[in-house]
């Protein structure tokens, strides 16, 4: 059953599963590309469909609501978080850029994004929204996410960040004992 978020500004439906086909449709081309990248590298299939109901031309509401919906769908996919490795990390170079991402799917939300990005828009996506996207995703997925990016091309930094985060999620979602000294995750 998909997670649906409907506001006066957007309508977003997300259904995630492990593996399988993936279909992503948003009104922001670069967001669509980054979501396809993130979810494919994470080994996730399903559907993400976002519609902008109130055209504000800044992308903020669409990006934020998509992050909320994807985060909640990921949290639902994890159920009780048992049987997963829990931790994951990846380093991804993309030409002159390099990005390190690390995640903990243990049920505690936190985020750190260190990526100097200019205040530009690529394919309808204002890059100033990237840290907000990561923060919102972390909060709604109940995950800790760290992203450190270096490089000169903002497109490369953001794309490598989505690849690295996807690979880190793939590792964290892989079968494992979900180490915890408390005996529970979350």
UniProtKB/Swiss-Prot annotation:
It is found in: Cytoplasm. It catalyses: D-erythro-1-(imidazol-4-yl)glycerol 3-phosphate = 3-(imidazol-4-yl)-2-oxopropyl phosphate + H2O. InterPro entries: IGPD_sf (IPR038494), ImidazoleglycerolP_deHydtase (IPR000807), ImidazoleglycerP_deHydtase_CS (IPR020565), Ribosomal_Su5_D2-typ_SF (IPR020568). Gene3D superfamilies: Imidazole glycerol phosphate dehydratase, domain 1 (3.30.230.40). One of its GO terms (cellular component) is cytoplasm. Coiled coil: none annotated. Its EC number is 4.2.1.19. Keywords: Amino-acid biosynthesis, Cytoplasm, Histidine biosynthesis, Lyase. SUPFAM superfamilies: Ribosomal protein S5 domain 2-like. Pathway: Amino-acid biosynthesis; L-histidine biosynthesis; L-histidine from 5-phospho-alpha-D-ribose 1-diphosphate: step 6/9. One of its GO terms (biological process) is L-histidine biosynthetic process. The keyword NAD does not apply. It is an enzyme of class 4 (lyase). GO terms for molecular function: imidazoleglycerol-phosphate dehydratase activity. Belongs to the imidazoleglycerol-phosphate dehydratase family. This is Imidazoleglycerol-phosphate dehydratase. It comes from Pyrobaculum aerophilum (strain ATCC 51768 / DSM 7523 / JCM 9630 / CIP 104966 / NBRC 100827 / IM2). The gene is hisB.
């Amino acid at each position: 059953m998909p997670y649906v978020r409907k506001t006066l500004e957007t309508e977003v439906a997300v259904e995630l599963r492990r593996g399988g086909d993936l279909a992503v449709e948003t009104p922001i081309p670069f967001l669509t590309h980054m979501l396809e990248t993130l979810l494919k590298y994470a080994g996730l299939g399903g559907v993400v469909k976002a519609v902008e109901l109130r055209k504000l031309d800044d992308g903020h509401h669409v990006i934020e609501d998509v992050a909320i919906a994807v985060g909640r769908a990921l949290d639902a996919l994890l159920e009780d978080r048992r049987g997963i490795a829990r931790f994951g990390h990846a380093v991804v170079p993309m030409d002159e850029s390099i990005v390190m991402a690390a995640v903990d799917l243990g049920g505690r939300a936190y985020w750190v994004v260190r990526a100097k990005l200019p205040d530009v828009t690529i394919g309808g996506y204002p890059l100033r929204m990237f840290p907000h996207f990561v923060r919102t995703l972390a909060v709604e997925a109940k995950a800790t996410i760290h992203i450190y990016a270096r490089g000169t091309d903002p497109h490369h930094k953001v794309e490598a960040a989505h690849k690295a985060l996807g690979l880190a999620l793939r590792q964290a979602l892989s079968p494992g004992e979900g180490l915890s000294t408390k005996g529970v995750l979350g």
